């Protein structure tokens, strides 16, 4: 059905097994839907449950001993004991995941071989495999590095190669779990531009787990988790109006949004949402003209 969400989470609770086999709650009665083609950022402090949530979506975590509720992804009931090996393979193909440290995802001695690793294991034949690798490298702007050794690349370049490896498997959704956390500003910019391109131009559903508020400002939708519970859910502009709730969740406003709040509280008129540097600069310029 056209209106069926790509991801449906219903009353999801999940616990890790702690000392003495006692469950430690991580997610608590979480319910939400994510539509295909959305760009969603999930925010939360350390221990909020955001990374656990992401890893449940494509079976990186597959022990549901202390789990309740439902996780439906691309039509598959992820927690069902009736999932076949073919179902699991299709689920992991349709939902790719990029982790914090790109070195943990790079397995080959040449960039193009690394990108080919995933689809090759899926049984993609030549010449389609060659075409997928070339297209994936072009998408992330790494074609000229096809014959380079991955370990000689910068952090941002390595992460783009890791992303290309997922793209080559033709996913419908990509999850980025703190994928910019270990990068310098240049590397972060490269990866964020790649993520936006995948969503805007390729139509890939993007779920980005982060604690960087400026990254959240780029998304269509922001979800805030705190202590395993859903605290806020809306557009960046809607979520950032709840500054007190964000602070209680251990989060700050994006710098540009904080600047706009400062201007308003000091009697300087500012119109519209201000979540990005471009919006901030334009608002300050317009306000200056009115002074």
Residue positions per predicted region:
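A short, flexible loop at the N-terminus of ABC-type nucleotide-binding domains that lies
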Residues: 2-6, 15-29, 61-64, 81-87, ...
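ABC ATPase NBD Q-loop/coupling interface
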Residues: 70-90
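Conserved ABC ATPase "signature" region
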Residues: 76-77, 127-145
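Conserved ABC ATPase signature
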Residues: 149-153, 157
